[in-house]
């Protein structure tokens, strides 16, 4: 992979190109320079709005990861994901990332709602050019089950958890489901 300096130099004659800005953003994010990465993701979203929808959508989601560990930036995180949903509402990834964030902050109604909305759009689509940590529809079902439990939907949650255990899911989801079921005394 090219260095940041090489990427910037090669993009210097075409800095409005969303592809160049996206590559630079990724390079900055990979070395932990999230403020710089965010700036280039924003440039990607602005310059690619009408021409590069997948890059724009991916950039808006990655912005949420850039601010994830920064205290006081919760609204920026939420807004970047809501903008991604507004921009491409028929894709599941931003719904998942937002639902998972709501789970982590114990906003159960919001978690449940965005998981449910995301489940409407889980058909196979063009792969994103960057990892946004969306493993598949089962992750939205997991978020729905966890938040449903806290919202008083015990039977629905147990049913979803048990159904997920019959599927090919990532080990961390399987162990989390097994742990949750052991805590509530169900299997």
Where are these regions (language model features)?
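Structural motif corresponding to the intra-repeat A-B loop/turn of tetratricopeptide repeats
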Residues: 31, 70-71, 105, 151
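Short coil turns that delineate tetratricopeptide repeat
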Residues: 15, 49, 89, 123, ...
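Amphipathic alpha-helical segments of tetratricopeptide repeats
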Residues: 43-46, 86, 116-127, 163-166
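Residue at a conserved register position within TPR or TPR-like alpha-solenoid repeats
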Residues: 28, 67-68, 102, 148, ...
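"A position-specific structural signal for the A-helix of alpha-solenoid helical repeats
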Residues: 23, 62, 97-100, 104, ...
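Start-of-helix register in tetratricopeptide repeats
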Residues: 19, 53-58, 93, 134, ...
